[in-house]
Design a protein with these regions (language model features):
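Amphipathic, hydrophobic secondary-structure cores in small proteins
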Residues: 27-30, 65, 91
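Small beta-barrel nucleic-acid-binding modules, principally OB-folds
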Residues: 60-78
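A short, contiguous structural element within a folded domain that forms the immediate neighborhood
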Residues: 49-59, 64
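Catalytic strand-loop segment that frames the active site of acyl-thioester-processing enzymes
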Residues: 2-48, 52
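HotDog/MaoC-like acyl-thioester-processing domains
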Residues: 1-18, 73, 77-79, 90-143
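A broad, structural micro-motif
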Residues: 33, 64-66, 110
Length: 143
C-alpha cells in the first residue's frame, strides 16, 4: 500500500475518534510503539467504531467479517503519551464496505489503515441490508 493521500491524514475529516492509553508493554527495543501494538490499537478502535454505528457482531441475520486489513506506518509513536484513532467509512459497495483509520499522537499521523468488511449470511457474502446502508453512509469520510 502506498503512502495515503495527504487529504486522508486530516483528522477533522473523520466522524469518529477514540483515544487509547499506550502501555509500556507496547514499546519495542527501538523505544517506540511496536507495529503489532499499533495494529491492535487499530483493531480496538475499529470495533468501537462498529459499536458506535450500532452494528454489534450481528447486522440482523447478517454478520460483518473483516476480509482484509492493510496498514502504513507513517512515523514513530512513543509511550507514555496516548494516541487517538480516527475512523470513517470510505466506500460502500454491494456486499462490502471499506473503513479507513488514522492513528495520531499529538496531532501527528503515526499510522493509517484500510480495512474491507463484508456482510456475511450462511458463510457467504450477501448484500448489505437496505436499512444498514444509510448508517454506513452517515459515518462516511467528511469532504
Amino acid at each position: 500500500m502506498a503512502r495515503p493521500d495527504a487529504a486522508l491524514l486530516d483528522p477533522a475529516r473523520y466522524p469518529f475518534a477514540h483515544q487509547i492509553t499506550t502501555r509500556f508493554a507496547d514499546v519495542d527495543p527501538n523505544q517506540h510503539l511496536n507495529n503489532v501494538a499499533l495494529a491492535a490499537m487499530m483493531e480496538d478502535a475499529r470495533v468501537r467504531f462498529n459499536l458506535a454505528m450500532g452494528s454489534a457482531v450481528k447486522i440482523g441475520e447478517r454478520r460483518a467479517m473483516v476480509a482484509s486489513v492493510a496498514m502504513e506506518y507513517l512515523s514513530q509513536g512513543h509511550f507514555p503519551d496516548p494516541v487517538t484513532v480516527h475512523c470513517a467509512v470510505e466506500r460502500v459497495g454491494n456486499s462490502s464496505w471499506t473503513v479507513i483509520q488514522l492513528l495520531a499522537q499529538h496531532g501527528r499521523p503515526v499510522a493509517f489503515a484500510r480495512s474491507a468488511l463484508v456482510a456475511i449470511a450462511d458463510d457467504r457474502p450477501t448484500p448489505i441490508a437496505g436499512d444498514y446502508r444509510p448508517v454506513l453512509e452517515q459515518w462516511s469520510l467528511r469532504a
